[in-house]
């Protein structure tokens, strides 16, 4: 029996793969900062560079693929953009995209050099993180938690399709 896959099924495969690859890596960000702090604040520049890389090269392309394949699935499937589960998931994806582009990426671009300076200023001694750095890093952690919850809600909407 030959392997046959429809364009809709392929789109669904791309959609799910983009979510797993693009956003799965970002869930690991929630443990990067605490692990770095347990080891040494000297690892924090790496944490911010890694988060920047994950957000720019994994999450942003994933958002594009998720949106493109999602719109394709709505147009080819028996769905309407006005369906609650689709509208809510689309709103969540837009919020996550905006958070990523307007908050997370700029925050890591700001925090990485800030903490690099603080590490350099410490020389061989203990690193003392500034109040500004701690405040901004805490804010980023809270925003990351909210984003993670939004992602889980979007996945639930896609799987359960309430109202469909």
Regions found by a protein language model. Name each.
Residues 1-164:
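Polytopic transmembrane helical bundles with strong interfacial aromatic enrichment
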């Amino acid at each position: 029996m030959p392997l046959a896959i429809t364009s809709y099924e392929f789109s669904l495969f791309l959609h799910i793969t983009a979510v797993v690859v693009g956003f799965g890596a970002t869930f690991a960000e929630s443990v990067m900062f605490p692990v770095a702090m347990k080891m040494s604040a000297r690892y924090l520049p790496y944490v911010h560079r890694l988060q920047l890389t994950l957000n720019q090269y994994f999450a942003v392309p994933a958002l594009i693929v998720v949106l493109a394949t999602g719109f394709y699935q709505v147009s080819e499937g028996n769905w309407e953009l006005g369906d609650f589960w689709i509208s809510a998931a689309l709103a969540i994806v837009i919020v996550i995209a905006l958070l990523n582009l307007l908050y997370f990426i700029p925050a890591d671009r700001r925090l990485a050099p800030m903490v690099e300076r603080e590490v350099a200023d410490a020389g061989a001694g203990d690193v003392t993180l500034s109040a500004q750095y701690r405040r901004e890093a805490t804010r980023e952690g809270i925003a990351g938690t909210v984003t993670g919850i939004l992602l889980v809600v979007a996945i639930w909407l896609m799987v359960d399709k309430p109202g469909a």
